[in-house]
């Protein structure tokens, strides 16, 4: 078995970027913050979004990818503890869903809250 040990989710649906934009806009004006962390992304849309990664896996001869959120999206320099924790949950939930949908192709690795001093326990759970 060939395992790619460093894969990031770089083909997220637009709803992820829209959520993050609203989340960051809420820093200046709370009215603009997202009302919910439910992005409304179906399982089918998630599976379709990773088709490029699956194609790269096949082309490179890899069987499995250790899969994590996009590193640049963590933005440790932006926001508050609450925003960091919420973004961490949203990002990790997407990775978990993809790995649940495609367990033969992906094993998830989560991110931790990127706000200084935010305890990892704030993300509320761990999936094994």
Task: For each feature predicted by the language model, list its residue ranges.
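Helix-coil boundary/capping segments in enzymes
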Residues: 1-125
């Amino acid at each position: 078995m060939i395992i790619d040990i460093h894969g990031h989710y770089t083909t997220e649906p637009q709803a992820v970027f829209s959520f993050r934009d609203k989340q960051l806009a809420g820093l200046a004006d709370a009215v603009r913050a997202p009302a919910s962390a439910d992005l409304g992304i179906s399982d089918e849309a998630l599976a379709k979004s990773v088709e490029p990664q699956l194609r790269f896996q096949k082309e490179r001869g890899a069987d499995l990818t250790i899969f994590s959120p996009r590193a640049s999206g963590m933005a440790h320099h932006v926001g508050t503890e609450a925003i960091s924790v919420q973004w961490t949950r949203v990002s990790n939930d997407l990775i978990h869903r993809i790995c649940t949908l495609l367990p033969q192709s992906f094993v998830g690795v989560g991110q931790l809250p990127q706000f200084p001093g935010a305890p990892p326990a704030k993300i509320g759970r761990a999936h094994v």
